[in-house]
C-alpha cells in the first residue's frame, strides 16, 4: 500500500470513528434529555389526576367521566389493583389495552419502547372507591419525541457524510502535500543513481516545516557528498600524477642502466642515484598519503595537557641534528600548557619547520607565548616567500606555488594539507603571512580556553 493511500485511509477512518463517537454521544444525551422531560411532564399530569380523583369522591362526580377528561390525545389512563388486574381502562386506541400491565406501589415515571415505539408511563398510588390502594397509570405515545429524535439522527448522519466527503478531499490534498516533496526527493535520488551526478531539489514556495527541513538536509548532504566526491576524484588524479613522474624517471633510468650500465660506470652510478632518490620521494609521498587518509577517518585525538614549548624544543633539536641547521626559539615563558595530542602536535611542528628549512638558507626563528589570552607558536623563515595569490591555496592537497622549486626540494604538496588537518582536529587556527623575497611566517593560534603558562 502506498504511503499516500495509508495517510488518506488513516485520516478518513480516524475522523469517521471520531464522528461516530461524538454523534452517538450527542444523540444519546439529547434523547435522554427529551425522554426525561416527557416522563416528568407525564408524572405531573398523573399527580393532577390523583388530586382530581380525591376531589371527585367528595363531589360525587363519576370517576370514568373524570378520567376521560384527562385522557391524552394519543394515550391511555388505567387503574391497576394489587392483584395485577385492570380495574378501569380508558383509551381511544384498542392497541393500548395490550400495553404491559403492572402494579406500582409508589410513584414512578419511566419511558418504555415496546415493539420499537416510544411510550412514557407514569404511575401514582391512590385509594379507590372500595378502599383498596390501586395504581393510577397514565401512558402516552411520544410521537413528537420520536420525530425529533429521527430528525436529529438524519441531521447527524448527513453531517457525518458531509464531513467525511470533505475530509476525503482534504485528506487527498494533505496526502499530496506530504507526498510530493518525498516524491521529488525519490526522483532526485534516482536521477543521481542513474546519471552519477549529484543534484539538489527545489525548495521554493515551501513553508519551514519538517518536510522543508528534510529537503534542506538532503541538499546539504548532496552538496557535501559532491564536495567529497570531487575532492576524492581530484585526489586520485593528483596522486596518479605525482606517482607518474617518479615512475617515469625510474623506468627511464632502469632502461638506461639496461642499455649502458654494464659498459659505462658513470651511467650506472647516475641511474642508481636517480632511482634511489625517486624511491625515497615515492616512499615519502606514500607515507604522507597514508597519514592524510588516516586523518580523514575521524580517529580519536588523545587530548592531554602538554607543554607546547617543551614539544617545540624536542622537534627543534631533532631537525637541527638531521639538517645541520640553526633553529632559534624566542619566548618569555618557561612553559606553555595546552590540551593537545602531543604526537600530532609534534608532527604539525615538524611539517612547518621542514618547510621553512627547505625554502630558506638562513636560521629559522620560532616564537611562542600568548596573545589576548590565547597560546600561539610561530615559525618564521627568511626565504624566498610566497606570492599573495597563492596563500589561500597553500593547505590544498598537492598545491605548489612553484612546481619546479618544489620538485627540487623533494616536496610532495601534502605536508601543509596534513598540517591543516591536524590543526582542525585541535581547533587550532593556522595563519600565513608572506612576501616574496622577505620570507614566510606560519602561526599556530590555540583557543582561548586552551592555554596556560608561566
UniProtKB/Swiss-Prot annotation:
SMART domains linked: HAMP (SM00304), HATPase_c (SM00387), HisKA (SM00388)
InterPro entries reported in the protein's UniProt record: HAMP_dom, HATPase_C_sf, His_kinase_dom, HisK_dim/P_dom, HisK_dim/P_sf, Sig_transdc_His_kin-like_C, TCS_sensor_his_kinase
Modification sites for Phosphohistidine: 241
SUPFAM superfamilies: ATPase domain of HSP90 chaperone/DNA topoisomerase II/histidine kinase, Homodimeric domain of signal transducing histidine kinase
Coiled coil keyword on record: no
Domain Histidine kinase: 238-450
Extracellular topological intervals: 34-153
Pfam family, one: HAMP
Domain HAMP: 176-230
Annotated protein name in UniProt: Sensor histidine kinase YkoH
Organism of this sequence: Bacillus subtilis (strain 168)
